[in-house]
Amino acid sequence: MTGFDIRERRNDIGLSQSKLSDITGIEQARISAYELGKLDLSVKEINKIANHLEKIDETAVLKLKKKRFQNSDHLDSIIAQRPRREFSKTKRNKEYLEVLKNLETQFTNPPKTGLKAVSFFAGCGGLCYGVKAAGFEIVATNELVENYKAIYELNFPNVNFLPNDVQEITKSDIDQILKNHKKIDLMVGGPPCQGFSLAGKRDVNDKRNTLFEYYLKIAEQIQPKVILIENVRLLTSMKDPNGSLVSKRILDTFEKMGYKSNFYNVNAKDYGVPQHRERVIFIAVRKDLKKSPSIAETKYGNSVNLFNSNPPYFTFGDAVSDLEFLESGETSKKDEHHWAVNHPEHVIRWLVDVPEGKSAHDNIDPNLRPPSGYNTTYKRQVWKEPAGTVATTYGMISGCRNVHPIATRALTTREALRLQSFPDTFKLTGNDGPIRTVIGNAVPPLLGFELAKFIKENYML
């Protein structure tokens, strides 16, 4: 969980740094500095904050504002007073589920290509899921956060884990990989970028500034045929503490390493993921292959090729319309990951009549508007459009575009997984807070598959 994530989640639930400090026992000054990117908290401290944020009941937090909502505990449920809403399967729900089933099949029984890949900053394995399904054997990986690593190991039980901290990976670790596997064809990963900023004013000594450098240093030792880096799209505008564009530094380093490289802005919805999710992808190709870097063509939505008309984007409804309809506080009897947070009644009243694509902040009646926040918060998704970006706060109704299009509640974990293109057989373990964080930060497996499949077909065969 980054400092930005903590600040965003605190603001969403109206929790001050001082209160968070009291709850966790972590000094407020340290929390503040971490949110500003000026120092690193330990993994133990970050996990402690994440767990406490998840456990905090929104009602308890909002009692701090009891003067505004002093009668909220005595309101009759407005949902119970109305006919129960419902939805039916969309025409393309079956098609989308077949896409996920095919992805699962290829992950379970991947093509026998003999191609080897390594992964760093693996998270729960979203990118690796797609890479394996495309026909690459993941022979080594690393992940710092134990909660995320536990989920990864459930789904990739035979992968060799390198030291959790990428800065602790030694030359002998790399030599052992090369000894065991002779060569590595593909290296993938998403080094964190919190040490950089748009203005280049972050602390020069911030350890996170070096994570990209460690990733590239490891790549130089391994010398894979192709290197892939995934990150937030904003990275292309970020600067290091010396004022240089991070993207240029990366490209220059690839050049010195003997690679041709470029970066591409992509949106996951163009590759079959039912979600607007903009990312930047760096592709570096070893010069001896005598090929230039490129990226997979889009497969869905408006096509730039007049002779190859792409099918429409998959939508929110296409992804989830076969699931049980749930209102606030309800739980599916069929799926342990499909349950809805029980939201305060006054929040339900703010949102119950809000149409798709609109926010409670847009309500004409000022008494039905949240007291603070932006109009992207308390906002409904749209059923017949790709979902907004699934964030780490998807279970918080006050978050950014987290409200279900039809039900008056935040998204469930199953819905978030579907919108991220994880097949239903993907396994989870741990507390809800870390699970939500790692799902919200994951690379959609379907995007990873299309990128890796293109790399295989254009640079490996």
Write out the residue ranges for each language-model feature.
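Short basic helix-loop element that most often maps to the first helix and adjoining turn
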Residues: 4-19, 23, 48
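Recognition helix of helix-turn-helix/homeodomain-like DNA-binding domains
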Residues: 25-41
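S-adenosyl-L-methionine-dependent DNA methyltransferase catalytic core
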Residues: 27, 59, 69-139, 253, ...
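DNA major-groove recognition helix of helix-turn-helix/homeodomain DNA-binding modules
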Residues: 42-66
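Core alpha/beta nucleotide-donor-binding catalytic domains of modification enzymes
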Residues: 70-223, 233-237, 243-245
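Short catalytic/ligand-binding loop motif for oxyanion handling, primarily in non-cytosolic enzymes
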Residues: 128, 194-198, 235-238, 272-275, ...
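Conserved Class I SAM-dependent methyltransferase catalytic core
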Residues: 210-285
